């Protein structure tokens, strides 16, 4: 078996690249989209559904799993793979973003971040060492360091101070889990807000720490699309070329295409499943709102170009009926389709890069989502 953490690049087309990342639970082909299973399950989707649509890796969240059911409970059951019956790779976020976004009361210090649970108000402390320990209990294939995700609009003084703290926390995470200690991989998270020089500084500082991969954090936090794209194309090429690059929490189909064009390998976002539960579905012709009356007697498939179970089996009329009747099956069928769309997107990107036609592939998505194109 190839050593976990081995990252091979198979083809390039401009900055876009295809490859594979070896983990303790199998190979992840890149570029890849990771369905989000925040509390250990991808909402409305069973593991066999994920297998059927070709998911290769899913994401879990340290903050949520620590609070409920508890990482030690999961560890006693053999780790998250045994607990949720997903046998392929799992990445766990450190929970830092949730601490800063969900916890109304929190205190940041050199030691870590103190916060109150959004469930019952109980007080907790996340240190770099603690989040590594939690993720070791979960036994995820890829663990993330504790970082501070500064909000959009934070001034330079605060952001510069935060970059220093995030760097020191990252070093403590690496010290708590030395490289090669076990089969779990540890990724660093670069920050820097919306200041290019601070982004460059953060990347340089974390590159000096020997992580198995590197993430771009703190994007898609409310900034204008043009600003996000500017920072993405500035930052991604600065990340080590021989390690996997991960754009956290992004995004729309065209965001992912732009990320791939910038040289990013890994993506996650709640958008496909959240929108599925709200009746917004992605198709080869763009977004479709299944709630619309025009679909009440439409016997055609949701997307004739899609081969997922939903599109092979059910009509738009039936899908609209399920949604308007508030049937739970609507969540599953819509989620199967949207996740298939996102996974087909990265599968298509891999093929386009290998064939040397990624620019053409990118233009095809710009034609589908013209409102998102940044000049």
From Swiss-Prot:
Gene Ontology molecular function = metal ion binding; tRNA-guanosine(34) queuine transglycosylase activity
Q: Which family does it belong to?
A: Belongs to the queuine tRNA-ribosyltransferase family.
Q: Which Pfam families match?
A: TGT (PF01702)
Instruction: Provide the cofactor note recorded for this chain's UniProt entry.
Output: Binds 1 zinc ion per subunit.
Q: What does this protein do?
A: Catalyzes the base-exchange of a guanine (G) residue with the queuine precursor 7-aminomethyl-7-deazaguanine (PreQ1) at position 34 (anticodon wobble position) in tRNAs with GU(N) anticodons (tRNA-Asp, -Asn, -His and -Tyr). Catalysis occurs through a double-displacement mechanism. The nucleophile active site attacks the C1' of nucleotide 34 to detach the guanine base from the RNA, forming a covalent enzyme-RNA intermediate. The proton acceptor active site deprotonates the incoming PreQ1, allowing a nucleophilic attack on the C1' of the ribose to form the product.
UniProt keyword terms in alphabetical order: Glycosyltransferase, Metal-binding, Queuosine biosynthesis, Transferase, tRNA processing, Zinc
Its UniProt entry gives the catalysed reaction(s) as: 7-aminomethyl-7-carbaguanine + guanosine(34) in tRNA = 7-aminomethyl-7-carbaguanosine(34) in tRNA + guanine
In this chain, substrate is annotated as bound at 93-97, 147, 191, 218
Per the record, which residues fall in region RNA binding? 249-255, 273-277
Please name the InterPro entries in this protein's record: ArchSynthase1/Queuine_TRR, TGT, TGT-like_sf, tRNA_ribo_trans-like
Q: Which GO terms describe its biological process?
A: queuosine biosynthetic process; tRNA wobble guanine modification; tRNA-guanine transglycosylation
Q: What is this protein called?
A: Queuine tRNA-ribosyltransferase
What the entry lists under Gene3D superfamilies is as follows: Queuine tRNA-ribosyltransferase-like (3.20.20.105)
The prosthetic group or cofactor this protein requires is: Zn(2+)
Per the Swiss-Prot or TrEMBL record, the active site comprises 93 (proton acceptor), 268 (nucleophile)
Task: Quote the cellular component terms of the Gene Ontology held in the record.
Answer: cytosol
Question: Taxonomic lineage of this organism?
Answer: Bacteria, Pseudomonadati, Thermodesulfobacteriota, Desulfovibrionia, Desulfovibrionales
């Amino acid at each position: 078996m190839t050593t976990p953490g081995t990252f091979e690049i198979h083809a390039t087309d401009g900055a876009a690249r295809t490859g594979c990342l070896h983990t303790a639970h199998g190979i992840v082909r890149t570029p890849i989209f990771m369905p989000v299973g925040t509390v250990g399950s991808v909402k409305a989707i069973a593991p066999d559904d994920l297998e059927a649509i070709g998911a290769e890796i899913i994401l879990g969240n340290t903050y949520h799993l620590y609070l409920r059911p508890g990482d030690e409970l999961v560890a006693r059951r053999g780790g998250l793979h045994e607990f949720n019956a997903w046998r392929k790779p799992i990445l766990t976020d450190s929970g830092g973003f949730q601490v800063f976004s969900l916890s109304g009361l929190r205190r940041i210090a050199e030691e870590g971040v103190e916060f109150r649970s959004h469930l019952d108000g109980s007080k907790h402390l996340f240190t770099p060492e603690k989040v590594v320990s939690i993720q070791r209990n979960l036994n995820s294939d890829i663990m993330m360091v504790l970082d501070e995700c500064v909000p959009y609009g934070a001034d330079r003084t605060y952001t510069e101070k935060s970059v220093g703290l995030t760097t020191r926390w990252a070093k403590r995470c690496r010290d708590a889990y030395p490289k090669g200690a076990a089969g779990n991989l540890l990724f660093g998270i670069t920050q820097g807000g919306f200041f290019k020089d601070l982004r460059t500084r953060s990347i340089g500082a974390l590159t000096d720490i020997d992580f198995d991969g590197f993430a771009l954090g703190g994007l898609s936090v409310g900034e204008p699309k043009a600003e996000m794209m500017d920072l993405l194309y500035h930052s991604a090429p600065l990340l080590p070329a021989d390690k996997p690059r991960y754009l956290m929490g992004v995004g729309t189909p065209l965001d992912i295409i732009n990320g791939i064009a910038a040289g990013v390998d890994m993506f996650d976002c709640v958008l496909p499943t959240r929108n599925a539960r709200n009746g917004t579905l992605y198709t080869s012709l763009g977004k479709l709102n299944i709630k619309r009356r025009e679909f009440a007697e439409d016997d055609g498939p949701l997307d004739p170009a899609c081969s997922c179970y939903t599109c092979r089996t059910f009509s738009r009329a039936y899908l609209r009926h399920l949604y308007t009747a508030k049937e739970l099956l609507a969540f599953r069928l819509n989620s199967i389709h949207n996740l298939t769309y996102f996974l087909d997107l990265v599968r298509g990107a891999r093929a386009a890069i290998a064939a040397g036609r990624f620019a053409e592939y990118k233009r095809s998505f710009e034609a589908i989502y013209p409102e998102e194109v940044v000049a």
